[in-house]
């Protein structure tokens, strides 16, 4: 058994195959426990490498377009900008792209921390009603004539990480705003069904075809070019599901093309800690 453990560990150390496991089925109790511990460590190691590869791939894919725009603008300013106005316009474009890159990097880091488990939940008694109400008030929907309708029951509390929960709700609201129609409607509903709080965010926008609904939770997944309009970051729904699951909750979508989407979050209220 020890030779088998050493051989597998050596193979992984040399980087040949991170999927290998010892899989010891016979031996002393001590050897079986040792092999099991090694296999668990190998699983975590493989997951870490895969997450790192995914992060590098995602970052490369999403940072390339704004980087290209910045380089092109720098070249244009250096060669052709002759007036102060042209310089300022070029600098403004560079600033917008740099801000986009900064936002992307921060969201990627947040996602990676959540997946690695290095971002621990800081649960506390949270007034979810107030949290959702505040985020709704902060939404800028006026420019496109979108009306935001609210049906939020008061004084609904849950044991939650308020910062992460705010991020999840904000992402859902932004998603509804970006993919809703001009002069359309967003409806936000929050209520208590017993053990859980239920949050519904509904729009009457472009909707999602059934064959895409299981895929929208993937990082950077885009259904089509029209859904890519806007920030283009494609991290919102993936992060929402990650945050909801960290709270032992669930999220579902009900949608039809050209008929809008309704995202439903099921958030356990949890038990208040005994003081």
PLM feature spans:
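Short alpha-helical segment of the dimerization/phosphotransfer core of two-component systems
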Residues: 96-101
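Glycine-rich GHKL/ HATPase_c ATP-binding element in histidine kinases
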Residues: 259-261
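Membrane-proximal HAMP signal-relay module
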Residues: 1-56, 68-83, 92, 113, ...
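Conserved catalytic submotifs in the C-terminal HATPase_c
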Residues: 23-25, 122-125, 147-157
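Short helix-loop "hinge" at the ATP-lid/N-box region of the Bergerat-fold HATPase_c
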Residues: 176-177
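Acidic ATP/Mg2+-coordinating residue in the GHKL
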Residues: 203
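Short helix N-cap motif at coil->helix boundaries in the Bergerat
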Residues: 128, 207-218
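Short beta-strand/loop element within the Bergerat-fold HATPase_c
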Residues: 183-195
């Amino acid at each position: 058994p020890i030779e088998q453990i050493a051989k597998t560990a050596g193979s992984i150390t040399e980087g040949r195959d991170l999927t290998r496991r010892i899989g010891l089925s016979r031996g002393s109790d001590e050897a079986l426990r040792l092999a099991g511990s090694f296999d668990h460590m190998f699983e975590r190691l493989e997951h870490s490498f895969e997450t790192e590869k995914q992060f590098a791939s995602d970052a490369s894919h999403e940072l390339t377009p704004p980087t290209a725009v910045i380089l092109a603008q720098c070249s244009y300013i250096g060669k052709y900008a002759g007036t102060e106005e042209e310089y300022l316009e070029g600098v403004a474009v560079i600033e917008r792209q740099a801000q986009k890159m900064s936002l992307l990097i921060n969201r990627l880091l947040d996602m990676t921390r959540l997946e690695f488990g290095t971002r621990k939940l800081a649960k506390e008694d949270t007034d979810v009603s107030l949290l959702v109400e505040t985020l709704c008030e902060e939404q800028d929907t006026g420019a496109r004539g979108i009306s935001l309708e609210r049906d939020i029951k008061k004084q609904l509390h849950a044991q939650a990480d308020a910062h992460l929960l705010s991020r999840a709700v904000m992402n859902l609201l932004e998603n509804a705003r970006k993919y809703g129609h001009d002069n359309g409607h967003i409806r936000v509903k929050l209520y208590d069904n017993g053990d859980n709080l239920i949050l519904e965010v509904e729009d009457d926008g472009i909707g999602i075809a059934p064959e895409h609904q299981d895929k929208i939770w993937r990082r950077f997944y885009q259904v089509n070019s029209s859904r890519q309009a806007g920030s283009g970051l494609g991290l919102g729904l993936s992060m929402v599901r990650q945050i909801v699951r960290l709270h032992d909750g669930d999220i579902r979508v009900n949608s039809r093309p050209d008929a809008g989407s309704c995202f439903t979050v099921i958030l356990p209220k949890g038990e208040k800690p005994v003081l």
